[in-house]
Amino acid sequence: MAERGYSFSLTTFSPSGKLVQIEYALAAVAAGAPSVGIKATNGVVLATEKKQKSILYDEQSAHKVEPITKHIGMVYSGMGPDYRVLVRRARKLAQQYYLVYQEPIPTAQLVQRVASVMQEYTQSGGVRPFGVSLLIAGWDEGRPYLFQSDPSGAYFAWKATAMGKNYVNGKTFLEKRYNEDLELEDAIHTAILTLKESFEGQMTEDNIEVGICNEAGFKRLTPAEVKDYLAAIA
């Protein structure tokens, strides 16, 4: 009860030392569609559940797995409109870096800059935190990278992780299945199986999205490619 008076103020700490609006933003992430990221020896895979709104909906009109540069891509759990703002901001930050240094932005640099944007929205008046967590995959300096960034602006490097609805089940499954020698092909299968752990209904190429990042760059798999992977694990 004592914290209720602080729940609408973003810039005021509650007596227990929390910024309650950030707690609410994390709750929005935990209620969002599940997403999974796995770093393999030769690449990174991102996978997410894509809810079908209606049979009349054009599935290709909006994507959850988005490329930021040729070698970096990301996915989210949480609020879609907030994510699209961050996608645009991330692309702009990457372009600004290229204009200054004449080389592609390293993955860790982009994560740091996007996380700084998210952190700004936790201490400014008249705004609210972003209701999304991001998984950012990249390839540079001959190796893969996987990061997660939260509404608070905190970011961490991961070998494999899950977020969104039932993320605890996803992480438990990954802890059992993950090993350091995982190849990209196996990682794709593992990511889909992780999503399947908490998936409701029939999993098809229309209601999941998969992106991969390796030496060749980042790409979103086509529905036909996803269908082949689903057939392989059936």
UniProtKB/Swiss-Prot annotation:
InterPro entries: Ntn_hydrolases_N, Proteasome_alpha, Proteasome_alpha-type, Proteasome_asu_N, Proteasome_sua/b. Coiled coil: none annotated. It comes from Xenopus laevis (African clawed frog). It holds the Pfam family Proteasome. GO terms for biological process: proteasome-mediated ubiquitin-dependent protein catabolic process. The 26S proteasome consists of a 20S proteasome core and two 19S regulatory subunits. The 20S proteasome core is a barrel-shaped complex made of 28 subunits that are arranged in four stacked rings. The two outer rings are each formed by seven alpha subunits, and the two inner rings are formed by seven beta subunits. The proteolytic activity is exerted by three beta-subunits PSMB5, PSMB6 and PSMB7. The modification Phosphotyrosine is found at Y121. GO terms for cellular component: cytoplasm; nucleus; proteasome core complex; proteasome core complex, alpha-subunit complex. Keywords: Acetylation, Cytoplasm, Nucleus, Phosphoprotein, Proteasome. Belongs to the peptidase T1A family. This is Proteasome subunit alpha type-2. Component of the 20S core proteasome complex involved in the proteolytic degradation of most intracellular proteins. This complex plays numerous essential roles within the cell by associating with different regulatory particles. Associated with two 19S regulatory particles, forms the 26S proteasome and thus participates in the ATP-dependent degradation of ubiquitinated proteins.
